[in-house]
Amino acid sequence: MELKLATAEKQVLDELVKLLQSRDLRGENGNWKEFLHVYDKNADSPSDPSRRSHEDLVQFLTTFKKKEDLQLLKCHANHLLIENLKQESQDEDTPEQMLVRLTVEHPSYSLDYSFKPYSEDWFVSDVGMKMKKVMESTNMVAVDCEMVLCEDGTEGLVRVGVVDRDLKVILDEFVKPNKPVVDYRTDITGITAEDIENASLSVVDIQETLQPFLSTGTILVGHSLNRDLEVLKIDHPKVIDTALVFKYPNTRKLRRPSLNNLCKSILGYEVRKTGVPHDCVHDASAAMKLALAVVEKRVDTTIKPSKEMLEVEKAKLFLHKIPNNVPSEELEQVLSGKFTLDVKQAKTQGRYYCAFALFHSSEDADQAFEHIDGIEMTDSLGLPQKVVIIKLSSGSRASIYVRKMVQDE
């Protein structure tokens, strides 16, 4: 870590020492004042970190050896990197940096990317401690993951795809979950128990493969990328999230266009047909193509939904606040009629997940909503929704919310 600290900006080192001071954390030579007492015998020397030399600060910081302390320092340096980016003028932004800026300035960014990566199995990028040249790198790789539901209600990584700027596949591997799996979500992921039976790679192996890219300041690209980073257990500040970059006009900022709708609007094709399982390499490539459409072709990040897209939205119902212990197969009982379920992995390893019910037409979706035996209400944005109680095959009960995607006319 000393070599990496030696390349850090003086201002970053000042803030890191102040952080350690505020938490009264101790390295091998004690806290900051105790360190100075040993390191510098001159009683008149200043203790304010901003008045100490670059070398003094590095000497103190290198006395911290515990992994959790190092994780804390790197996280704080990365946070400073993002805050500095927000304060800097946009005039000199490269197109890639502009997309990073659009991501980190989105109202949902701070919540979606507020990881707590202090456990042993997390990898925290050290790019915030690098020289400005490295931090300004415009190299990009796109990432997408497939996840399953584990016995303890968390998400388990089972496949990861990574492509570079030229859409060359860097990584396409199955990963062995380290917990028992209760739902492979095969209809969504296309993955079965047999697919990962012989998988030998772990999350740590994937982290080690990506580490050279992260340490050189490469930008990670993805759609709802926070979900992928959460399951990869990677904290990296330089991200382009196409779910946050692109937006619909005259709609609430928190409404995010789907990857499929973005591809239809900007690239002119669907990333997948309805009912076809996900493919992480295809999804990673789609996210990279969307980023490149802005970088190379200056495509507008505000997209206008077509009549076809609006009709597609009307033909959906949104099932949300689904407890993680409810298998996706049990959701079939909630709605009547013919539909396909598109299950979405949880944004974080929390208590709930969500799904879309895709109907043949808006009329079918409206009829299914009317037939739901539940309490009707509206959400905070005035969209009609119902809360329904279902009985699971296990004998227990669960409450689920079902919401329309568009206001009633």
Swiss-Prot record:
Residues 140-291 form the Exonuclease domain. Disruption phenotype: No visible phenotype; due to the redundancy with other SDN ribonucleases. Simultaneous knockdown of SDN1, SDN2 and SDN3 results in elevated miRNA levels and pleiotropic developmental defects. It comes from the Eukaryota. Its EC number is 3.1.-.-. It is an enzyme of class 3 (hydrolase). It is found in: Nucleus. GO terms for biological process: miRNA catabolic process. Pfam families: RNase_T. InterPro entries: Exonuclease_RNaseT/DNA_pol3, Nucleotide-bd_a/b_plait_sf, RBD_domain_sf, REX1-like_exo, REXO1/3/4-like, RNaseH-like_sf, RNaseH_sf. Signal peptide: none annotated. One of its GO terms (cellular component) is nucleus. Presence of 2'-O-methyl or 3'poly-U in the small RNA deters the activity of SDN1. 3'-5' exonuclease degrading single-stranded small RNAs. Belongs to the REXO1/REXO3 family. This is Small RNA degrading nuclease 1. The gene is SDN1.
